Amino acid sequence: MSYAYLFKYIIIGDTGVGKSCLLLQFTDKRFQPVHDLTIGVEFGARMITIDNKPIKLQIWDTAGQESFRSITRSYYRGAAGALLVYDITRRETFNHLASWLEDARQHANANMTIMLVGNKCDLSHRRAVSYEEGEQFAKEHGLIFMEASAKTAQNVEEAFVKTAGAIYKKIQDGVFDVSNESYGIKVGYAIPGQSGGAGSSSSQGGGCCS
């Protein structure tokens, strides 16, 4: 399917926060409760529509283990957007956000759009991080913020699409040189009048989540 733009995303965060589950829910609209841990990097893609234009999202799901951080860092380059994910039931995953963000700021392009996602909001009875804390962290660091549930699909679509909307606005505002693919944006060849639809393409699972 033709697209007006292709945006490259990376999903980052600690092991077990649900990165792979978020990707699978977005691309395949299903939840897989038991996964093998992601080894290195896995990939998914899906078409969405923004401003009546078909946009292809190419999403790289990364391993959260420290031993894979060097591999993950290489994927920051050439990413237009990132989902930085923590688990609202595990305080330590929130505490590690600053380290992930430092990595992103150091290795990614300065205009990369970052969406902070507090995953597993379906387990709010086990909450260890308040909504306000997530919101405050995002505000302090210039991130977009949303709580989501890969299990129930709450806000999963919105997290990916809102990130794409912010990237698209930056293109409209002339922030990106779209001829430079190192920004994680590729100009496509959209067929006039064709809508992007919400059809999904291939994705592979991985990671561990509730």
From Swiss-Prot:
Cell location: Endoplasmic reticulum membrane; Golgi apparatus membrane
Binding annotation for GTP: 13-21, 61-65, 119-122, 149-151
Motif Effector region: where in chain: 35-43
GO MF, any single term: GTP binding
CDD domains: Rab2 (cd01866)
Pfam families (alphabetical): Ras
Annotated InterPro entries: P-loop_NTPase, Rab_GTPases_membrane_traffic, Small_GTP-bd, Small_GTPase
Predominant location: endoplasmic reticulum
NCBIfam families linked to this entry: small_GTP (TIGR00231)
Protein name, as recorded: Ras-related protein Rab-2-B
Organism of provenance: Zea mays
Lineage: Eukaryota, Viridiplantae, Streptophyta, Embryophyta, Tracheophyta
